[in-house]
Amino acid sequence: MQNIDLISEKEAKKLLEELADKIAMYNHAYYIEDNPLVSDSEYDQLFNLNLKLENTFPHLVLSNSPSKKIGAKITNKFAKVIHQAPMLSLSNAFDEEDIRDFLERIKNFLRINEFTPIFCEPKIDGLSFSAIYKHGLFITGATRGDGYVGEDITINIKTIKNFPHKIDNAPEFLEVRGEIYIEKQDFVNLNKEQEAQNRGKFANPRNAAAGSIRQLDVAITAQRPLKYFIYSGGVTEKNLASTQEQLLAKLKALSFSVNEISKLASSEEEIFAFYEYLKTNRHNLPYEIDGVVYKLNNFAMQNRMGFIARSPRFAIAHKFPAIIGQTKLLSITVQVGRTGMLTPVAELDPLEIGGVVVSRATLHNFQDIARKDVRIKDYVFLQRAGDVIPQITGVDISKRSNDTVKFDTPVFCPSCNSKLRYVSEDIIIRCDNGLNCPAQNYERICHFVSKNAMDIAGLGRKQVAFLIDKRLISNPLDIFFLKKKNETNLIRLENMDGWGKKSVANLWQNIEKSQKISLQRFIYALGIRHIGEQNAKLLAREFVSYNNFIAQMELLSKNDSDVYQKLNDLEGIGDKMLVDIIDFFYVKENIQLIKKLGAVLNIEDYKETREQNILTGKILVFTGSLKTISRVEAKEIAEKLGAKVASSVSSNTDLLIVGVNGGSKLKKAKELNIKIIDEAEWLAFIKCLEKEV
């Protein structure tokens, strides 16, 4: 974790941009692909770093900030369901101090001094879902999706044992929300079946549950041992209860499965006692839990507290610490990524941690190996927090033998044997051989065909590797001539191992379908280092059309100062991204490839869809005591209308809203000639804007 106090504004801006892209990628892998790329603890560290940066530099908060998003964008695999009320995530807490801060925030917001009852319940590690009933009949089930739009999994939910299709004495309209999960022993049995049928094993129970419920073939879902718990109500025609405790009792009476392990805490001590109880006994439970959820028990108080961008103020998740294990390090392999970055991966003597067999772990970077003095044949400590690839946290020196081998940091690329470049004090090592490096070329093609890029279904990593190995493709362009090439081959693709007439016919259809693509997705598909989906959208918005984009990039490759300045001035494109864009287009082969792709693709112009108002992007500051609403509520309203709220007045401030006793901020705003309005003017102003929105 970086020291926020020592970071400059320029560095903060770069870091926020990098975090937005990285967290978006991790969200997509976790929520959509059901395939986490990093540990829960590593993700939480990145997310918390993003929050701290935003709190320190509120005027730098990005429009695509992870703190404003829930889950990830949904795919086109299922029909879409718009949630009548957003399905929000919970903020995370990692120690008792975080929980004390949470309880203090409740008191301050509600302006109360006494402890108000908190409902405590286990945090199930599964897939969140919503179920809607009309006149007692189950009509719609949906995943969380991005929090606003989910995937329609109605038929799949109906296969879950004991899930009620019809309920008696229900209100005319009822929504319930819960978690779909697979018990630990069922998970072990399922993986044995997968192995016996020569199918891929699931990494953990959460992945198994998510992958099972999101099956297009409902017959597969029906065979899976899925279970569920309901933990809250969503939108309903009439109030079922006035507290969380009453609600769960009512839902149980309506025949829903609710978790019986819960506690209504009347003190801070009772909260922490319940947490310790569950932390100690979690391994005795038949299902995975990764923490405890605390909620204000009183619904009226919940409604008063409301929400921030992605989570409720009245609830929080107290996460458990990571599970620790120990095993032998057998070897270290080096992987080469799409952008040429090398990543060391530990190959381990398989070890079961928390019900999951672990055989690989991340070593983060080469400097980390040296710092921890990790050697081949060492016994290493592992940390796992519900993740696919755990982390190596240290070495058991007491078990070190004389035959351990120090790892030599590579000098040449393991894929193409070209000399490597060391970046950032040896933390990052890159191969600069680009498309001439087989590993980079493979990863680049995989990225090009991925769902958020060209979205060519039927071309997964395995299929891409096969086509490259058979010399049927060598770059992204070859994909669009594959059908023609196949027709002239002596042995056709449909007659090769792993393929058939139907899969090949579907592939041709999917390739043809992919040839119509938006400019922002095309730019993202190119795989430019540090240019994720949001930054690709920024570039598309700036250049609008493919023809203009490639013309401007060609000028950039010839050191055109106007194009350089245009990119340099583009809000959201940091210095590091600018260098990466320049490096990418300096390579003539890249421009040639893009031009050839442009000739075979129908690349649509960028179209702006976001609604804006006069406050969008403006920086506001509040000062003094507000009489009508609390400062927190005022900030929330401003942010909903697109403004950014800062804690101090600067030359970047657009508007100061003054309550009682404005103080030094008012004085400074007058000195800087910043527009100033009082609370009444502000309330009248936002009332007009909210009507427009």
Curated annotation (Swiss-Prot):
Xref: InterPro entries: BRCT_dom, BRCT_dom_sf, DisA/LigA_HHH, DNA_ligase, DNA_ligase_AS, DNAligase_adenylation, DNAligase_N, NA-bd_OB-fold
Cofactor(s) needed for function: Mg(2+); Mn(2+)
Gene: ligA
Catalytic reaction list: NAD(+) + (deoxyribonucleotide)n-3'-hydroxyl + 5'-phospho-(deoxyribonucleotide)m = (deoxyribonucleotide)n+m + AMP + beta-nicotinamide D-nucleotide
Species this protein is from: Rickettsia typhi (strain ATCC VR-144 / Wilmington)
Record function comment: DNA ligase that catalyzes the formation of phosphodiester linkages between 5'-phosphoryl and 3'-hydroxyl groups in double-stranded DNA using NAD as a coenzyme and as the energy source for the reaction. It is essential for DNA replication and repair of damaged DNA.
This protein's UniProt keywords: DNA damage, DNA repair, DNA replication, Ligase, Magnesium, Manganese, Metal-binding, NAD, Zinc
SUPFAM superfamilies in alphabetical order: BRCT domain, DNA ligase/mRNA capping enzyme, catalytic domain, Nucleic acid-binding proteins, RuvA domain 2-like
Protein name, per record: DNA ligase
Residues the entry annotates as binding Zn(2+): C413, C416, C431, C437
CC annotations in GO: cytosol
BRCT domain: residues covered: 610-693
